């Protein structure tokens, strides 16, 4: 079968009908920032707040998706070496790009179904984040994507170091650590700019919730 043999099939249930059933519009809220910046913490608080307010939401966390959707070659070893090598994703620039592409495509599908889809990934490269923005914009609309920059200084992220990754990177035990020997490209014009060193996680989550409620057509 060739790509030309594939045909897009429109659903008999439109996006508008799904949104009407949900009571709000779907969107993708993409949290990006260094490891330890607070992305997952804030995203989880946002998810809980939305759920408590009757908003249908779902969180795609970077570590969680690495256990399945974007699993590493090591995690796929039981499928055989060739399979693991072909489909497993490590942390090279190319693998990071595919990681973001897979998660972005999944997030777009969830948002199309009417869910407020929260994504918490380091996603260090600007072009990869922009590619997701473009995909969501083309499939749903430009207002359906929000880039949320979790702007926490590297020294604070290193002090927190909840997974011990910075310690390993500084000791030469871990390669391709974003912020140490792999670059992080700050967003140029994020929809929401969170300063992780200046506010509590709860305060930051409140900022995000207020913006999201306006975006999806719900009163704050």
Go through each PLM region and give its residues:
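Conserved lysine of the Walker
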Residues: 39
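The conserved Walker
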Residues: 35
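Conserved substrate/cofactor phosphate-moiety recognition/catalytic segment
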Residues: 44-108
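ATP-dependent NMP and nucleoside kinases share a basic, alpha-helical "lid"
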Residues: 68, 75-78, 85-90, 102-170, ...
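Small-molecule kinase domains that catalyze NTP-dependent phosphoryl transfer to phosphate-bearing small molecules
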Residues: 151-154, 159-210, 214-220
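Conserved beta-strand scaffold positions in the cores of enzyme catalytic domains, especially
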Residues: 59, 145-147, 191-193
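Residue-level preference for the first positions of well-ordered beta-strands
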Residues: 26-28, 56, 116-118
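Extreme N-terminal, non-catalytic leader segments
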Residues: 1-29
